[in-house]
């Protein structure tokens, strides 16, 4: 039985996708679902090479004919997953492989299981109930049955913020492990313009 589906929405990351995939343990109970969102570089070819290299029957690659944004790509990932739990991996992020395997032992039916992460400057983000970082880039293993039909809005930025707000509205059971499982590429675009655009997306969504 597949325990975890690692979901990778990707667009034009041929130089970094290999690192992300190599960080995922090769195990019979782990599935990779990579959705190429209409890349114009060699990302799709790199994914196919990596699947052949791993010789992994649980490595699913889906190629979308045109770029529709990360929200849509995330939803295709969720629709295609088969594991008991799902976890997103940004194509420019990577797991700490041994810690990932330790984390799998803690998946005991809890709806959302959180793990700490490391960011670009080496800081460790410790996640807990009151942490504002819980919704941004956090390592969340999500029980797929609990996720149900919750999906990301098909917007260009901040789609995960709305997705996790939806999940929290379902009153999930939660656990915080303290394990550092992922390196998170943050800030991805540390400009004020990026922050302003993200807030604009949230405002537009609230008005719908």
What name fits each language-model region?
Residues 127-199:
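Conserved nucleotide-sugar donor-binding catalytic segment
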